[in-house]
Amino acid sequence: SPWFQGKGPAVPALAESAWIGGWREAGDLTPDSRIIQGKLPNGFRYALLSAPRKGKVSLSLIVGAGSYAERPSERGYAHFTEHLAFTGSTHYPSGTAARFFEENGMKFGRDANAFTSGNRTVFRITLQKADQKTLSESLQVLSDFAGGVLFAPESVASEWGVVLSELALADTEEGRTLADLRKFLYGGTQFEFLPAGDPAVISAASPENLKRFY
């Protein structure tokens, strides 16, 4: 695929439906023989699996970096970057990726979504029609997420509120108990902190620092 053959950083990826089978280069488990796996010259890994859902294609881009890659001054940068990927990129500036999803019958949350964990950031797209044009453009969107996020100042400013709202919603008794438990179990390590981040760090995040982390 030409979308991921550039000279940018290698980004591991695999089909969403292949995730359970797992990507194992070594170990005791035998990979599912139905999964076609490979690696492009730039190090980008891929896996393909024919699924029983006719007329639909599920794509996942799995970036091998999450909140564990953050310094204390970057708490929440991986999660913030995940948000910003949808707001503007090289081929889809100013939120035009959202228009592409809508024009092709996809809805945010259901068909286009993402999440950040400690060791990965995952973008998922489910195509409601499996024609070549839609597939080609969807791969371009994921390629942009991998190496073409723009970090426009206006996008960073608009997403501040969104990310901080998510943090506020999580600031419940249950959420605080979980934070205390993680601190007790993992205090002093990267495992102590949730990917959502630190409100103070998020509020001070600049486009330049976010792009440097990216």
Task: Annotate the PLM regions.
Residues 1-48, 56:
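Proteolytic maturation boundary segments
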Residues 8-19, 87-92, 114, 138-141, ...:
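Scaffold signal of the M16-like zinc-metallopeptidase fold and its non-catalytic homologs
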Residues 29, 87-91, 125-159:
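M16/insulysin-pitrilysin zinc metalloprotease superfamily fold
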Residues 41, 51-53, 62-66, 89-90, ...:
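Solvent-exposed coil/turn segments that connect beta secondary-structure elements
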Residues 46-49, 55-58, 68-71, 133:
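Short, solvent-exposed loop/turn elements at domain surfaces
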Residues 58-126, 173, 192-196:
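M16/MPP (pitrilysin/insulinase) zinc-metallopeptidase core fold and M16-derived inactive scaffolds
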Residues 94, 98, 102, 150-168, ...:
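Acidic/histidine-enriched alpha-helical segments
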